[in-house]
Amino acid sequence: MSTPTDPAAMPHPGPSPGPGPSPGPILGPSPGPGPSPGSVHSMMGPSPGPPSVSHPLSTMGSADFPQEGMHQLHKPMDGIHDKGIVEDVHCGSMKGTSMRPPHPGMGPPQSPMDQHSQGYMSPHPSPLGAPEHVSSPTPPQMPPSQPGALIPGDPQAMNQPNRGPSPFSPVQLHQLRAQILAYKMLARGQPLPETLQLAVQGKRTLPGMQQQQQQQQQQQQQQQQQQQQQQQQQQPQQPQQQAQAQPQQQQQQQQQPALVSYNRPSGPGQELLLSGQSAPQKLSAPAPSGRPSPAPQAAVQPTATAVPGPSVQQPAPGQPSPVLQLQQKQSRISPIQKPQGLDPVEILQEREYRLQARIAHRIQELESLPGSLPPDLRTKATVELKALRLLNFQRQLRQEVVACMRRDTTLETALNSKAYKRSKRQTLREARMTEKLEKQQKIEQERKRRQKHQEYLNSILQHAKDFKEYHRSVAGKIQKLSKAVATWHANTEREQKKETERIEKERMRRLMAEDEEGYRKLIDQKKDRRLAYLLQQTDEYVANLTNLVWEHKQAQAAKEKKKRRRRKKKAEENAEGGEPALGPDGEPIDESSQMSDLPVKVTHTETGKVLFGPEAPKASQLDAWLEMNPGYEVAPRSDSEESESDYEEEDEEEESSRQETEEKILLDPNSEEVSEKDAKQIIETAKQDVDDEYSMQYSARGSQSYYTVAHAISERVEKQSALLINGTLKHYQLQGLEWMVSLYNNNLNGILADEMGLGKTIQTIALITYLMEHKRLNGPYLIIVPLSTLSNWTYEFDKWAPSVVKISYKGTPAMRRSLVPQLRSGKFNVLLTTYEYIIKDKHILAKIRWKYMIVDEGHRMKNHHCKLTQVLNTHYVAPRRILLTGTPLQNKLPELWALLNFLLPTIFKSCSTFEQWFNAPFAMTGERVDLNEEETILIIRRLHKVLRPFLLRRLKKEVESQLPEKVEYVIKCDMSALQKILYRHMQAKGILLTDGSEKDKKGKGGAKTLMNTIMQLRKICNHPYMFQHIEESFAEHLGYSNGVINGAELYRASGKFELLDRILPKLRATNHRVLLFCQMTSLMTIMEDYFAFRNFLYLRLDGTTKSEDRAALLKKFNEPGSQYFIFLLSTRAGGLGLNLQAADTVVIFDSDWNPHQDLQAQDRAHRIGQQNEVRVLRLCTVNSVEEKILAAAKYKLNVDQKVIQAGMFDQKSSSHERRAFLQAILEHEEENEEEDEVPDDETLNQMIARREEEFDLFMRMDMDRRREDARNPKRKPRLMEEDELPSWIIKDDAEVERLTCEEEEEKIFGRGSRQRRDVDYSDALTEKQWLRAIEDGNLEEMEEEVRLKKRKRRRNVDKDPVKEDVEKAKKRRGRPPAEKLSPNPPKLTKQMNAIIDTVINYKDSSGRQLSEVFIQLPSRKDLPEYYELIRKPVDFKKIKERIRNHKYRSLGDLEKDVMLLCHNAQTFNLEGSQIYEDSIVLQSVFKSARQKIAKEEESEEESNEEEEEDDEEESESEAKSVKVKIKLNKKEEKGRDTGKGKKRPNRGKAKPVVSDFDSDEEQEENEQSEASGTDNE
């Protein structure tokens, strides 16, 4: 047996290695890391167990429950120590529980083999050699402890023997317990009782302490008795036990503050508390026993042999107190020493030997295994062999580890403190405490489990969150990348677009700057086929025109040469024969003619001196002058010879001009050699190059530009002709004269298109006088003018050129016939006539070969197929022609072509080519949208290039800066109540309400259907009294006797008249004179009544005014101090060619469809010579058809601006100015700056006032007018209101519908009397017959004869059936005409209209009309996707139109279309939308309306059947009562029936339907039957 001094057997203090695997060697076949079951070193602490197998009390205290419970309880205590919460208030009780010895129910201790196999340390001492391995000096039979040294609740002290007196007295122990209890209560925060305070101070013991002392004394006495008995039995062992008792007692005193356990004695409130803060780690796990290692065999053998006799092992610490008492009793009863059992050391050694033998045998078996084993078995065998070979190494390693641990341990109890703990009695309170702690532990475990689960769920949620965040970040990155890519593409596209725009701007810049080469290069770079095609066609067309112009000039020159030769030959023959000179018509010149007063050029035969002009003799005095001046003779050159020389010298001039051009190119402007004349030429050339965009330099081939070819011969005109007197031409008029002279020199014709008022008449007279003086072209000149301007032309000729002989060809046929001899004699220069007489008297006027034909207001020739153009082209010979017009392009480009074709038919041949080239940007069918700005400019410039040589146009603002400004205002006018009602009915139904007098229903009201609705609407806007029956009915209503309304009711019925009533008095007060233009003569009559009511002096000029009276009217109005305030003119008759510059205010009462008519009318006042600012007031009714007319007029003016004005054919505008003007038109063409507001008095005054003083005066006049109206007791509003209207005009919609149906019924089925006869408005006579009838004076008789012949011829044709079959066999080519449907019965139409009106007018509870969006569909342009989805679009407007055109034959057809409309809405719109729901409601409304009408029909049919039955019964009764029958022949019956039918037409029977398909034969048959019927009567 090893002593405590032996270092190998001495227990060393140190940390417990815990319940880990045993460090002993592996003694089994398994080479794994688990503990060996037979290892001596497998336990680190003492293993308590039975001292002997045969001991009767060895199994006492065993119970059937596992020992892991205590280890599980120790585990959380370790966590408490680790977390540092030992100082917690509730920690003490848990510590006590953890340090308590095992419960009796913890079960029996396991065997050493099981302990080794499980791999954890047991807290009990080993049964294999208790005397050797347990280092307790107390013998097994001794009492557990001495009474003096016993501390209640101390498990170690209970197992200690009594080694002498205790160091503490009982009083000190009582005071110590009281102090511990007080400390515990203070730690819990509880108050200390007085008894406890006295006990702490040692003044008094706690109650129950005395009983405890007595028990302790009894226990001490018992222990002394036991010690005496043991001393007698075991005296040799006593010194050793005493030697060990002292260190153990000291160890107990050292470990006493570290124990946390308490015992509850029988006394109340007594507790023993020991603080465990000093060594928590050592108490938290079982400590090893510190048993010496069995490795050194020398130490083991003495230990085994030193045990004398049987030894009794002390009871396990977990045994309860009854077991101890029983053990004490047995030791007292049987003190005999028990026999010694088997030596466990030898058994252990034998077991070791056998295990080693088995291991060696197994190693040999594994080494001798064959090599042909499968791989898996071989692997297992190899692993097992290597494990067995490692056994000794593992054993050595474990010994070294244990040796090291033994050195670190000083006290045996430090390794396993629980081995010496005294077993304590378990009280009920401790059991409850244990149960409570167990519940807390379970709750804590559940909390931890839930917390762990919550953490798990949180980790899942966090993972999901991270997952989402990750993918969101990935998606964000992808989105950013996509955005970056899209941005890159957008930037690239933007840059490309900018580059494209830059190239387009550069191209436009070069196009505008006339850099043709650069422009073509850019076109080639872009490879725009469309622009290249336009350029190519432009070049081809212009080149073609250039060739045509050149050919035309050559042809004219050749003709002129032939004529000159012929004339020269005749002149020579006449000179030889002494015949008088011939006139322009080939006849000899009469002395009384104008030609006799012209100077004749003569030359001196010797000197060659030529006399011409005033110095030359006149033609009438030529012979006498030659006799008086010998040596002179008539110069051989006549006017024809002069023109011949011009044409012969044309080529020479061209060559010289080319040489001059070359010289100009060689000249250096900066050199000193350049003369002043050359410098001027250079400047002029530069100006021309800048101004004329078409004058190009000669190309390499020397060809000239289009304009240069056209105006090859140029002549400078610096002053007007001497024949032009009483005035001087302005500079721009001289330029116009020069341009016309250039046309004459180049054998071309043109259009003088100066704006109205710039003096086209004066320039024409100047051209005639210039040609007469300088070109010897005395005429005859044919000037064709409108009838309204004929007197003005005569006046201007008398004023400017009185020496020119003129004939005004007009008047009655007798007057015109009286002028024929003068025409034939040629004793005149100019013939003035009108368009009508040119056509009527062409057999007279066309015989004269006119030198010049001048057509004023040339836009009359705009229609190529009009009669005037055809007559002039076919009958009249005039090689030189000029058109005068202020509006060269009024509506369409073909009109412009018609003018050019009339002037130059050889150049402008095909209208289709011209229109195809230039009509694209102006077509109203959408072609204009397809052209971009550049293509539009190209096409317009191409048209300008074509027009420039033949058209000259200047505007007033350009040529006459002194001309006062012209300001135009569009004034919106309101309607009166009468106008509004009439307008609404006319617009919606096409009817005009009447009082019913035309149908003998006077006062009940009626309706009158009128054709040409737009014209009727314009009449209503102007004045409702333009309808005579309305005026008569209102006259009767207002009490006027003669059926004509006068006075204030005239202006109260019309909004425009009311506006005039406010404006005209102000203009008269400020001495402004007014031109008032109207479209309708009946309106002018109403206007005259109004002027008479207001006492305005006026003049009237319209189409009925005679030509003689017109000049007198103009003279009256224009004379200074004229008393006439207003000139009332019709737009068509008085808007052309009149000079009315005395007026400074123009009122356009109603606009014309052609805006140029209104412009012409405005320029009657805004002319050269006007001194005042001109105000143009255009009246327009709000929300009426007049606004549409104004919009159409604006579009036409837009076309004119693009073509004519942007060309700026004024010969001096630069290309930059023309480009800027055209660009401004294109940019602002869609702006609309009008408002629909009716202006108030202040706004009106601002419009018509020229100065501030006038504005103030007008405001005062308005104030006075309002005051006067307020003073009038019978005052009425300025415009008529609804309460003033008669009852027959205020009808509800149902009544108006009824009247409309009646009117339609009469219109379709007739009045029932007879069929309407056709009226032939065509001319019955041919022109020859008409002229002959005029001459004979029997015009009416001739017309009647022709009509009778036509009627007979038609009857003969009707009787011929063969012709009828031939006509039927003939078919028109192309698509057959659309058949007109036969009309429906009025009742069905009425029902359909009633149903549709019910559906359309249906409103919901909120008052919203559901059918508003269904009335008219949006256009394809606004909503293209609707028409892609819906195959058959339909709306209520189309349905009503089909009802009107009788497309529906039954209500079922109507229902199909309405259902289709609703179905379309439901297909296109989403389910649940408002339109979708409205369509469902409208379906139900339609069905209910149809059912209602069906019920009404059934009730009507039933009532009709009842009436018919009653009629049949009456007729039967009448037939029975009649006894006498009168027989008549069939003719009499037929005649009587016809007479009855005429007297009382039967509306119940079917009436003949008049349709467009009735042939003429059927109509005549009906007429004949009617005629025979009337004859029989």
From Swiss-Prot:
It is found in: Nucleus. Residues 1059-1221 form the Helicase C-terminal domain. Disruption phenotype: Impaired social interaction and prepulse inhibition. Residues 641-655, 1497-1516, 1557-1568 have a biased composition (Acidic residues). Residues 167-202 form the QLQ domain. Belongs to the SNF2/RAD54 helicase family. This is SWI/SNF-related matrix-associated actin-dependent regulator of chromatin subfamily A member 2. It comes from Mus musculus.
